[in-house]
Amino acid sequence: MSIIVALDAKSQYDALKIVEQLDPTLCRVKVGKELFTHEGPSVVKKLQEENFEVFLDLKFHDIPNTTAQAVCAAADLGVWMVNVHASGGRKMMETCVERLKAGNYQTQLIAVTVLTSMGREDLKDIGLDIEPVEQVKRLAKLTKESGLDGVVCSAQEAKILRELIGQDFSLVTPGIRPEGSNADDQKRIVTPKQAMLDGSTHLVIGRPITNAENPTEMLKSILASIA
């Protein structure tokens, strides 16, 4: 399944109301920091009870041992995917991979490169005088070398990364907006069809689906556009 629906909800109740209108055979769902902080692991279990595979989007970033423990705790919940910040470095990422393998977990582990809301000036503010795409390339290569399953990247960078890294690597792309949607707070955006053509393997889509009058029909429309 290529579509991951971002559950931008504050409560378990709101999240479950959203997934009531979705088909778990057509999409996976993403639980982020706000929802998980409000509701904890119970919201993951409830979504799994509704047969949804969960991407736990908590972007762990800490010393290697602490990050690996957090990743394994997420895997203990049975989530399909979890992520870390690639800027945590090689040792941090390699430790996470080693612990997942040691525990025989099936959870996919990916890394965040450059947040999609960040442009060159934002990077400059934190001491990186570099174009976002160059930093993305650097961190994506490090992620692959560290043994992770993929990265989060913008669709504009997907084609470059596919050529740089090869086929056996997931490119999970937020900032996806169907034709006519608002950009909201994502700076580097593109349509679902173009993202898939450029090499993305999974598309993270939130408000265009969850705020639609009929979320299932919107989801089916997006799937048809990338078929």
UniProtKB/Swiss-Prot annotation:
Reactions catalysed according to its record: orotidine 5'-phosphate + H(+) = UMP + CO2
Domain of life: Bacteria
EC number from the UniProt entry: 4.1.1.23
Family matches, as CDD domains: OMP_decarboxylase_like
Residues annotated as binding substrate: 8, 30, 57-66, 116, 177, 186, 206-207
Any one cellular-component term (Gene Ontology): cytosol
Entry-linked InterPro entries: Aldolase_TIM, OMPdecase, OMPdecase_AS, OMPdecase_bac, OMPdeCOase_dom, RibuloseP-bd_barrel
Similarity remark: Belongs to the OMP decarboxylase family. Type 1 subfamily.
HAMAP family in alphabetical order: OMPdecase_type1_B
Protein name: Orotidine 5'-phosphate decarboxylase
Organism of provenance: Acinetobacter baumannii (strain AYE)
